Amino acid sequence: MIAYARITGQALDNRPIKRNRSAGLLLFRRKPRLEVLLGHPGGPFWRRKDDGAWSVPKGEIEDGENELMAARREFFEETGYHPTGSAIPLGSLRQPGGKQVFAWAIEDDWDPEKLISNMFSMEWPPKSGRIQQFPEIDRAQWFGLELARKKILKGQAELLDRLEQALSSPPR
């Protein structure tokens, strides 16, 4: 069954296999020190979480989509903004939950006050029968690298190191 699922993308009972891959963009600016833009997840689970809760705006890669296309689409869906500039590849990493994340960095100076996030629905409170909508990202903010290392999800912290390394390497 595993081989069948890998080839067809479906389990034997025709259920689609959940893809465990996502892609995202890490915006950065130099004002004059290096800062990165992180998003805080929306919804009741994340409401009171701060340190270790912020994320690179990212999401699932759709069928037929390459990783960079997915990263750009997801950034727009979660922020309402299309960043300009060239994408610097940061590679991929595997988060503690097993999801593989592909990431790029783009230099841009977007105003997070203009955040317009897409929404998701969930039953809240649990077992209440009430379906409520929440933003995927409830706020976005620029952080210097030292503070960003405290704010970002532990499984994504390596992306900050990769960005620093990419920016300090001579151009090819």
Where are these regions (language model features)?
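Alpha-helical and coiled-coil interaction segments, frequently adjacent to or embedded
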Residues: 2-6
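The catalytic Nudix box helix
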Residues: 56-90, 144
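Short, charged/polar surface micro-motifs in flexible loops or helix N-caps
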Residues: 31-34, 43-46, 62-63, 81, ...
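Alpha-helix-centered segments that form part of catalytic cores
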Residues: 130-149
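Short, P/G- and charge-enriched loop/turn segments at secondary-structure junctions
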Residues: 9-15, 126-131
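Charged phosphate-binding loop/patch that engages nucleotide di/tri-phosphates or the phosphate backbone
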Residues: 145-172
